[in-house]
């Protein structure tokens, strides 16, 4: 929005030449981060008071960790603050004509709406189960598939009109259209190698990345500050990849696919980092507010969508290793419990408690130890992911 305003002012008078600074992506990225940070810090106390007045407190289940029972009643659905900060900041600083930022915003808000409905049922309607799993996955799948169908053609085209033309030609050809190499699965640490996916392969992979990332972040969000800081780190690293793939010069030099327009995602990533740090101010132990599903599902979906656009799905799994391991721990626990119950008549557990962060708590780690150590691991994994920029 401000970019369009600056361009208009420059067109009517040379006196506004100083507004050329708005054309620099890095300047707008820094301002987006600061704007989101300030919005979050200033609006945070009001949002928390409002949540308390509405009695939107986090219910703690009886089988949860005993040390967590004191958290019962802590305001939840604080993800609204994160989404508000990201949304306002991004709309102010990004190029309004950029389709990639719009699709990320829409996916983020869509998954946020699913999380909001889930939280609302749990907290306000007093339904401990919230949205049923099938209903939640149905809506997640719908949004994920729509986003995947759009992205499969938009990666290789520069306008929405061309995206529609390519889609209809794909349908008319009997669903047989070859995608360019840059739409393939990029293999990290290997120069100029991408695995061709085809339209259906791209759609399936995109769906799995978006929905999987969303639920993985949601499962990780179980301790004060545990999920938000890794989101900030991974989102910031993805912003670097967005900047590289959006630049014809840097992408060629580093042997990355050039995706025109993807650099503008740096604005969204910066806003997400600023909003995340602002939320951490209130979410650090002992937390004054929890993000709830409205925040966790939305942020995870945003990370997944950005990774797909910049063709870094594998690198996302590396940098977001904590999210991956947390999700796998739940899946392994459930599968092993059902298997042993069927075979031995008694369900057995691989972990003392899932997700994995609770296993470490039951092993004697303090909550803050688990959180900070997971942060350190994420920071190291992000450095490994960023090293793929050059180690090819």
Curated annotation (Swiss-Prot):
PROSITE patterns: MRAY_1, MRAY_2. Its main location: membrane. One of its GO terms (biological process) is peptidoglycan biosynthetic process. Its cofactor is Mg(2+). It catalyses: UDP-N-acetyl-alpha-D-muramoyl-L-alanyl-gamma-D-glutamyl-meso-2,6-diaminopimeloyl-D-alanyl-D-alanine + di-trans,octa-cis-undecaprenyl phosphate = di-trans,octa-cis-undecaprenyl diphospho-N-acetyl-alpha-D-muramoyl-L-alanyl-D-glutamyl-meso-2,6-diaminopimeloyl-D-alanyl-D-alanine + UMP. One of its GO terms (cellular component) is plasma membrane. The keyword Acyltransferase does not apply. The keyword Ribosomal protein does not apply. It is found in: Cell inner membrane. Keywords: Cell cycle, Cell division, Cell inner membrane, Cell membrane, Cell shape, Cell wall biogenesis/degradation, Magnesium, Membrane, Metal-binding, Peptidoglycan synthesis, Transferase, Transmembrane, Transmembrane helix. One of its GO terms (molecular function) is phospho-N-acetylmuramoyl-pentapeptide-transferase activity. It is a multi-pass membrane protein. Pathway: Cell wall biogenesis; peptidoglycan biosynthesis. Belongs to the glycosyltransferase 4 family. MraY subfamily. This is Phospho-N-acetylmuramoyl-pentapeptide-transferase. It comes from Polaromonas sp. (strain JS666 / ATCC BAA-500). The gene is mraY.
